[in-house]
Amino acid sequence: MEDLILGDALIEMKNIADNSIDAVIADIPYGTTKCSWDIIIPLQPMWEQLHRVIKPNGAIVLFGIEPFTSVLRSSNMKDFKYDWYWEKERLTNIAQVKKRAGKTVETISVFYKKQPTYNPQMIKYEGKKRTNKVKNGKMGKLTDTQQKKVKEYKDTGFRYPTQVLRYQRDILKSNLHPTQKPLALLEFLVKTYTNENELVLDFTMGSGTTGVACKKLNRNFKGIELVQKYFDIAKTRIGETNEQI
């Protein structure tokens, strides 16, 4: 199920039922560009609506970039828990690299009141695999219990995710929206914070990447977009995804 809404997020969210959303995943405006739509949403009214619609154990996952991220965190320090860092494959401020560090990172801030769904998406490890062979050296011999644990250990070649996420942009789709995020990154977040058939809200959905990820992963989706152009793109993309499933 998907429900796509054209309109102002703060107004349209008032029509969403209390405690009906399993997770919020959104790339909200940072106020760092000259685009007409890149105006920071008033944060306190935003939090009022998000707290009302999210389930008690739902995660609110919001993209950002400094200095906006610091403002976002500070607006709800009580619920802020941690950040992910999306590391891009190329600089976004190449004209400034002689004056300041190159920008390759955007933040993804996670907020919640109670422990939400968390499904760790294991990352393929490219380094040397761990061995179950342990050499007894100067530190002394292993106990029988330790030896048993070592013998039972098998390296699968995968690791739990760390805060740094490396995803390349979707080159063929990157012109759909100025702040387009990789589909694989959104799939990672959707799988991490929701289970199948749950409902995800993106209240600034842009060209609909979160919605596409939800449809591919058998999640329900509710999206709100202010700009007609991007709403139409999102509607088309999500519709095409439905046809491909």
Describe the function of each predicted region.
Residues M1-G223, K229-F231:
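Core catalytic lobe of class I
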Residues A234-K235:
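Conserved SAM-binding loop
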Residues G239-I245:
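Generic C-terminal helix-cap and adjacent flexible tail
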